[in-house]
Amino acid sequence: MFNEKDQLAVDTLRALSIDTIEKANSGHPGLPMGAAPMAYTLWTRHLNFNPQSKDYFNRDRFVLSAGHGSALLYSLLHVSGSLELEELKQFRQWGSKTPGHPEYRHTDGVEVTTGPLGQGFAMSVGLALAEDHLAGKFNKEGYNVVDHYTYVLASDGDLMEGISHEAASFAGHNKLSKLVVLYDSNDISLDGELNKAFSENTKARFEAYGWNYLLVKDGNDLEEIDKAITTAKSQEGPTIIEVKTTIGFGSPNKAGTNGVHGAPLGEVERKLTFENYGLDPEKRFNVSEEVYEIFQNTMLKRANEDESQWNSLLEKYAETYPELAEEFKLAISGKLPKNYKDELPRFELGHNGASRADSGTVIQAISKTVPSFFGGSADLAGSNKSNVNDATDYSSETPEGKNVWFGVREFAMGAAVNGMAAHGGLHPYGATFFVFSDYLKPALRLSSIMGLNATFIFTHDSIAVGEDGPTHEPIEQLAGLRAIPNMNVIRPADGNETRVAWEVALESESTPTSLVLTRQNLPVLDVPEDVVEEGVRKGAYTVYGSEETPEFLLLASGSEVSLAVEAAKDLEKQGKSVRVVSMPNWNAFEQQSEEYKESVIPSSVTKRVAIEMASPLGWHKYVGTAGKVIAIDGFGASAPGDLVVEKYGFTKENILNQVMSL
């Protein structure tokens, strides 16, 4: 039963959120004031999260998908002992632990970075997917070593975003029973009344996806909220609980209006609101000891007991299933097996394969040595070569399966991969055509902001796609991805560069990787293995030509590298000194020492030509004012791939002409 102390705690969370925003003179008080009861009920009665043991693997995950309500999350983290009160006073200030929207790895207790609406919801599907897969893989009768929930607090805006439709469809199809969404249904959006833009039947929508739907008519009724969460945890399939709330609850002049969504209440309205709560408006950032004690005696006590029981269970599990236990411990550590490279292929001279196919070969090898390797494609596995051969598909019936069928849901796939990476225990990946990377670009950006070990496979990387035409031929995508900070964008030139690219992807603990791969075949370059290994890791290196300072530099990535080598050989026949540089990863190259960069691209050599079947954006930094860029300023065309490539000037003859014109 709930009592007056519980109501005091709820109102304290509201007041803390208000004061946090007032001091910053910036923020969104409406959601915290309306949603505090459901958050309080969840945290004190259900959530297994221990601020004193934040890395406890079997903890429940809480995601504030409506990231603009961050003041509520920070207030919860404070009263539960995870965040100092001083940090609330520094909300949205330089160097604080309380940024405007929650940030993963910045504030303890934040599971994923949220703010762009819909993505938190979709990443939560990834969190629940990770739990389901790991449970299916490691749990044995009497030993549920993976057994936790993912709880989401979502807003109207989250459910309007297209990604929520993709993610909800996927979650329902896969019966992710450990996913519970609390929907803060307050009928107000930033611009005004919600019914001006949003009138769908939430119950019908989610039941059509295969979700359970529950309704709490009064968002201040702690008992009803508690009952709904309890019911949700006992049902098969994901559950959404629509909780009807009043935005800005307690504010006499702003409650129920968009005026309280994204602006401080102001001093006068704050005073009136505190009086409505029965709190002293003269006291700021005030938390009574009895509120702290509530969290100590409920949430923290429960979490400590849960972790203690889990540790004991894990010890017994290790005795009964020693090999599985070792694999589990390695998985949750995030580390790779020491022998993970043992099965990786070496591609010999004379091998001629598309980098997507060579990547597929690498994937088969990784799956044998990295048990935590898990992912799939957005309905293009046959083209992306991304499935693990002879492996079981992931499904609600076979959650231990390795191949995920994401369906044509690119954005949700990207967010789900991020969620899986943030969850831990997996090295996740997702795959689609490169031109469709635009569909999941915001997820790539969040992956980079969070610094996740996530891999994105993008195949069919250029106009060489051919017949499908300009809608399916990437042009501006490469420059767009390279512009994302903290993103490894690797476009390998052959099978061996592809192998090392995968090594980089798996080993990059705080940088996501985009692998950009060809449809067409590429010859293996005549470069020693150790040179390829070091060169790809450093982002650029010499693959052909003069070790001395050359007269000409040919710079390229991916499929154009072998073309540059052909041109270089002809130039050498004409007595010219040429060096060909493969530049698979600009991000890595820019992190190298000036000495290394100078050794690869000598500043004294001004006669430079860059060759890439994509937008020229970015290449001028490397070719300089005296150099030239053979690239594409328009869109592609529909015709056989070889003909399209020729028509756009990616021929040995054109390269020679451009070089000789310098």
UniProtKB/Swiss-Prot annotation:
Site feature Important for catalytic activity, where: H28, H261
Keyword annotations of the record: Calcium, DNA recombination, Magnesium, Metal-binding, Thiamine pyrophosphate, Transferase
Entry-linked Pfam families: Transket_pyr (PF02779), Transketolase_C_1 (PF22613), Transketolase_N (PF00456)
List of residues binding thiamine diphosphate: H68, G115, P116, L117, G157, N186, H261, F436
Domain of life: Bacteria
Binding-site list for Mg(2+): D156, N186, I188
Active site: E410
GO biological process: DNA recombination; pentose-phosphate shunt; reductive pentose-phosphate cycle
Cellular component, GO, one term: cytosol
NCBIfam families linked to this entry: tktlase_bact
Functional note: Catalyzes the transfer of a two-carbon ketol group from a ketose donor to an aldose acceptor, via a covalent intermediate with the cofactor thiamine pyrophosphate.
PANTHER family noted in UniProt: TRANSKETOLASE, TRANSKETOLASE 1-RELATED
The name this protein goes by in its record: Transketolase
Gene giving rise to this polypeptide: tkt
